A protein has these predicted regions:
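A polyampholytic, Gly/Pro-enriched intrinsically disordered region
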Residues: 121-132, 191-206, 285-294
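PAPS-dependent sulfotransferases, especially Golgi type II membrane carbohydrate sulfotransferases
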Residues: 1-68, 211-219, 223, 227-241, ...
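PAPS-dependent sulfotransferase catalytic domain
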Residues: 4-232, 236-247, ...
């Protein structure tokens, strides 16, 4: 059988069918991934006449074959986050730099990162599939691509060790924010992980104390565990912590050497930062104070109980030394030991 050619095609969905994992592909041509989220780019691509007329569905073998025939870029930066903390702004800023391919929460990646929760035997092929998926996304469709930045879903913090084993030399960032502001944002517009049972099997399911959490405390409990997981990464030297309030200046400030920011690009990045990351047609408007004022006493109490301690632990981490070459791993800050305690 002649191997399939996926030039200018990208995987848009990974799913299990009749006991085997399948991929849906769509043709993107040479159009860059320019929207705030990968799913937005997929929506645009599926409106193209070509994709209305022709779709491709394959097994994982085709993905592995394509990786062998046309190796793509490997990740140059992994971005973990708590959600609602500026990760989309970071992605949009890096997307504005020449040669950068930015994957923003692609659902096929999330599906493969969490496949072992559904099928324990998947651990035999999961890592290879994730690497092959990155290769497919890292194809040089425009010809000038040099870096592949991957922004994970917030709950993929619990799969961070798999990614660190695959890419131990790749720098990682962990973005976080005052948990009260995150919880209020999730109350306004809940994400998949903000509603128990909606996300499906994930690392949140096996966390201790879940049964004892009152329904009204779930968001604060969930955000607290995301902060704790991020702290663990940063304290072990596996990621650099970045508070929302440091954005966007940190990108061309102390993180500039790590991210390879050319000083000549700063005016352009500053202009991009002035737009709303999720609604680029609108100007950015800070909302932290409004979110804090919106929180009622019960929400404040839940955040203090479940999320304040890991947030303070992150704030207490020493700043990382500057990195002069983004192709090398991050130097490790002093190790820390932290356990989240419900007061």
């Amino acid at each position: 059988m002649t191997p399939l050619d996926f030039t200018e095609w990208l995987p848009i969905r990974a799913f299990e069918q009749a006991g085997s994992w399948q991929l849906d592909w769509a043709w993107f041509g040479t159009a860059p991934l320019a929207r705030p989220f990968f799913s937005d780019d997929v929506d645009d691509a599926l409106r193209l006449p070509f994709n209305l007329a022709l779709r491709r569905q394959t097994g994982l073998d085709a993905l592995f074959d394509w990786q062998a025939r046309s190796p793509g870029l490997e990740p140059s930066l992994l971005v973990f986050h708590t959600s609602r903390c500026g990760s989309t702004l970071l992605a949009q800023l890096l997307r504005a730099l020449p040669g950068h391919v930015v994957l923003s929460e692609p659902p096929p990646l999330d599906a493969l990162l969490r496949v072992h929760y559904r099928d324990p035997t998947a651990s035999a092929w999961q890592a290879d599939a994730v690497r092959a998926l990155f290769s497919a996304y890292g194809q040089r469709r425009c010809g000038d691509e040099t870096r592949l930045v991957v922004k994970l879903d917030a709950w993929n913090l619990f799969e961070a060790q798999l990614l660190r084993r695959l890419y131990p030399e790749v720098p990682c960032l962990f973005l976080y924010r005052d948990p009260l502001e995150v919880v209020v944002s999730q109350r306004r517009q809940p994400g998949l992980h903000a509603v128990p049972g909606l996300l499906g099997p994930s690392g949140l399911d096996g966390l201790p104390g879940r049964e004892a959490v009152a329904p009204g405390d779930y968001l604060a409990w969930m955000v607290g565990h995301l902060l704790q997981a991020g702290f663990g990464l940063c304290a072990a030297g596996e990621a650099v912590a970045l508070n929302y309030r440091e954005l966007p200046d940190a990108l061309w400030g102390h993180l500039g050497p790590l991210l390879g920011i050319d000083p000549a690009a700063v005016p352009h990045l500053q202009a991009v930062a002035g737009r709303d990351a999720k609604r680029p047609g609108q100007a950015f408007s800070a909302d932290g104070e409004a979110k804090r004022n919106e929180a009622d006493e019960a929400t404040r109490a839940a955040v203090e109980r479940w999320a304040r301690a890991p947030y303070q632990a992150l704030e207490a981490l020493p700043p990382p030394p500057l990195v002069n070459d983004a192709s090398h791993s991050l130097p490790k800050p002093p190790n820390g030991d932290f356990s989240m305690v419900a007061n």
